[in-house]
Amino acid sequence: MIDETLLEAEEKMERAIEHAKEEFGAIRTGRANAAMFSKIIIDYYGSPTPLPQMASIGVPEPRMVIIKPYDNSQTNAMEKAIRDSDLGVNPNNEGNQLRILLPQMTEERRREMIKVARHKGEEAKVAVRNIRRKAKEELDRLVKAGEVGEDEGRRAEKELDDLTQRFVGVVDELIKHKEAELLEV
């Protein structure tokens, strides 16, 4: 029972970390990367579709992105969605593809992105702590019901705390790495 609860908590925490990594990948840094466009949604014949499912995204140079739509009739919709996004970029529509030159990030924009990264990191930490809280409630329920002894319950709680600390540490590392990436000129 205890092992199952701890294993389930660990799996959920790992999923929270994966989600945080995706969120951090979507934050724009000074360099171009395809993940920047993963959160852009385009209305594709009435259904909201993520940009990466509608086009191939290439990064031929550190500050250039080429987006080649699978359906050329959607090029204008993609251009508008990218322009309206919070990325702060202006795509050049070349008919069959979009060329995006990323401007050099200003110091102010870098600081703004660091705040966004810290906020996303805090959200990930809260998610990990919520998972811990739910697992602890389950452990307390098991002890109260008499399914496991109090000593075993305390040992499991300590394991859960260690697990939580480990995953919060991973989030801290992700934040530190993203800040360094953003401050790199």
UniProtKB/Swiss-Prot annotation:
One GO biological-process annotation of the entry reads: translational termination
Chief location of this protein within or outside the cell = cytoplasm
* Subcellular localization: Cytoplasm
Q: List the disulfide bonds.
A: none
Check the record and name the Pfam families matching this protein. RRF
A GO molecular function held by the record: ribosomal large subunit binding
Q: Which UniProt keywords apply?
A: Cytoplasm, Protein biosynthesis
Provide GO CC annotations from the record.
cytoplasm
Q: Which InterPro entries match?
A: Ribosome_recyc_fac (IPR002661), Ribosome_recyc_fac_dom (IPR023584), RRF_sf (IPR036191)
Q: Which Gene3D superfamilies is this protein grouped with?
A: 3.30.1360.40, Ribosome-recycling factor
- What is the purpose of this protein? Responsible for the release of ribosomes from messenger RNA at the termination of protein biosynthesis. May increase the efficiency of translation by recycling ribosomes from one round of translation to another.
Q: Which family does it belong to?
A: Belongs to the RRF family.
Name of the protein described by the UniProt record: Ribosome-recycling factor
Give the encoding gene's name.
Answer: frr
